[in-house]
């Protein structure tokens, strides 16, 4: 396995000139955010991810209204819990530029971590799915100093450790401290940064930037709507 590290010059990425920027994630008032969330939850509050139901431990839940209570240590990550689905754009060394669909699941089981799963599929020029793209899974943790740890595994042969912090109540920035690529993994994947944030529409936006040469360049970004939770 090969390892890369990230330079210590953090960059706050945006979602692009054609859409809301993640730097706008704190621009909505608290009361407006609550009202918007209440309206949107009318179609998502009754849904949850499936569980086996016969385990001697709690099933994962992506709906804060169901299952075990969220651990007190995760309150700074609470807005992420749910299932999010939408579309994004990629510009990678492996596959060039393309559009993709994505579903992200943030779930918990009452313990002091969030589980994370991302599934992606490529889209053609008409927006039709053409096949499976990338998958990721991992865990988010945050300590009493609001320091976030994100362990992320990629199905394509990458394991990464990110550290970061909340930028505000609706945005979270992460920087890769270790990017390990297997012998069959993407040798061109450099270290990078990610920013996740709730837009004024309460959609979840995220941006992944990677080191190319001496500069960080956008690799992937997406705008996702809550479908569960």
Curated annotation (Swiss-Prot):
A motif (GXWXGXG) lies at residues 82-88. Disulfide bonds: none annotated. SUPFAM superfamilies: Lipocalins (SSF50814). Belongs to the nitrobindin family. Residues 1-54 are annotated as: Disordered. PANTHER family: PEROXYNITRITE ISOMERASE THAP4, THAP4 PROTEIN. Pfam families: THAP4_heme-bd. Gene3D superfamilies: 2.40.128.20. It comes from Corynebacterium glutamicum (strain ATCC 13032 / DSM 20300 / JCM 1318 / BCRC 11384 / CCUG 27702 / LMG 3730 / NBRC 12168 / NCIMB 10025 / NRRL B-2784 / 534). This is Ferric nitrobindin-like protein. Residues 18-33 have a biased composition (Low complexity). CDD domains: lipocalin_heme-bd-THAP4-like.
């Amino acid at each position: 396995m090969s390892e890369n590290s990230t330079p210590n010059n953090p960059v706050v990425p945006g979602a692009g000139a054609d859409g809301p920027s993640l730097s706008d994630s704190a621009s909505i008032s608290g009361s407006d955010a609550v009202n918007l969330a209440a309206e949107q939850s009318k179609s998502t509050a009754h849904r949850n991810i499936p569980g086996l139901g016969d385990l001697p431990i709690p099933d994962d839940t992506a709906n804060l209204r169901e299952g075990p209570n969220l651990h007190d240590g995760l309150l700074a990550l609470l807005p992420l819990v749910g299932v999010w689905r939408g579309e994004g754009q990629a510009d990678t060394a492996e596959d060039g530029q393309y559009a993709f669909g994505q579903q992200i699941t943030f779930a918990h089981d009452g313990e002091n971590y969030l589980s994370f799963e991302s599934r992606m599929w490529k889209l053609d020029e008409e927006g039709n799915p053409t096949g499976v793209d990338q998958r990721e899974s991992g865990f988010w943790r945050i300590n009493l100093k609001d320091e976030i740890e994100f362990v992320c595994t990629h199905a394509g042969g990458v394991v990464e450790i990110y550290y970061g912090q909340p930028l505000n109540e609706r945005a979270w920035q992460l920087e890769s401290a270790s990017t390990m690529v297997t012998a069959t993994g993407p040798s061109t994947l450099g270290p990078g940064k990610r920013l996740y944030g709730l837009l004024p529409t309460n959609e979840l936006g995220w941006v992944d930037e990677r080191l190319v040469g001496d500069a960080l360049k956008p690799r992937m970004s997406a705008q996702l709507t809550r479908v569960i939770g």
